[in-house]
C-alpha cells in the first residue's frame, strides 16, 4: 500500500522517537526527505543523518539530538499537505515563534528555511514548522 503523505510520516516518526528518547530513527528515503534532514541538521535540530541502502531499498537514518535529557525539537508539524497545499510568496512566508523556530519551505531553488527564502527572494510551498 502506498503512503499518501511521506513527509508527514517522516515528521511523525521523528516526533514519536523523541517522545520515547530513541537515539536514532529510520525512515524510507527520498530526495525531499534528505533535503529536510539537511535543513534540520544545519539548524541544529538533529545531530546528523545517513542514507543507507539495503537490498534495493534506501533508508534515511536520522540521529536525534537531546539537551539535558529533553528533545531539542519541541514542536514539529506539517503545514502543506496533499489535501491542502500551502504556497507563500517571499514576503508572506510566516515566522515561527517570532523567529525562534523555522519554517521549512520548498522553492524552485531547493528546500530551505524561511529566513533563507526571504533573503533569497523566493517563495514556495511551506512544508512544516519546527520549534
From Swiss-Prot:
GO terms for biological process: translation. SUPFAM superfamilies: Ribosomal protein S8 (SSF56047). InterPro entries: Ribosomal_uS8, Ribosomal_uS8_CS, Ribosomal_uS8_sf. Keywords: Ribonucleoprotein, Ribosomal protein, RNA-binding, rRNA-binding. Pfam families: Ribosomal_S8. GO terms for molecular function: rRNA binding; structural constituent of ribosome. It comes from the Bacteria. GO terms for cellular component: ribonucleoprotein complex; ribosome. Part of the 30S ribosomal subunit. Contacts proteins S5 and S12. HAMAP family: Ribosomal_uS8_B (MF_01302_B). One of the primary rRNA binding proteins, it binds directly to 16S rRNA central domain where it helps coordinate assembly of the platform of the 30S subunit. Belongs to the universal ribosomal protein uS8 family. This is Small ribosomal subunit protein uS8. It comes from Acidovorax ebreus (strain TPSY). The lineage of its organism: Bacteria, Pseudomonadati, Pseudomonadota, Betaproteobacteria, Burkholderiales. The gene is rpsH.
Amino acid at each position: 500500500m502506498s503512503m499518501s503523505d511521506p513527509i508527514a510520516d517522516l515528521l511523525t516518526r521523528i516526533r514519536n522517537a523523541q517522545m520515547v528518547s530513541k537515539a536514532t530513527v529510520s525512515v524510507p528515503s527520498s530526495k525531499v526527505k534528505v533535503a529536510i534532514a539537511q535543513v534540520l541538521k544545519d539548524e541544529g535540530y538533529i545531530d546528523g543523518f545517513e542514507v543507507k541502502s539495503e537490498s534495493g531499498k534506501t533508508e534515511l537514518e536520522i540521529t536525534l539530538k537531546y539537551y539535558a535529557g529533553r528533545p531539542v525539537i519541541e514542536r514539529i508539524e506539517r503545514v502543506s499537505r496533499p489535501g491542502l497545499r500551502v504556497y507563500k510568496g517571499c514576503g508572506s512566508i510566516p515566522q515561527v515563534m517570532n523567529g525562534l523556530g523555522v519554517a521549512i519551505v520548498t522553492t524552485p531553488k531547493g528546500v530551505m528555511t524561511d529566513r533563507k527564502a526571504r533573503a533569497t527572494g523566493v517563495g514556495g510551498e511551506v512544508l512544516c514548522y519546527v520549534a
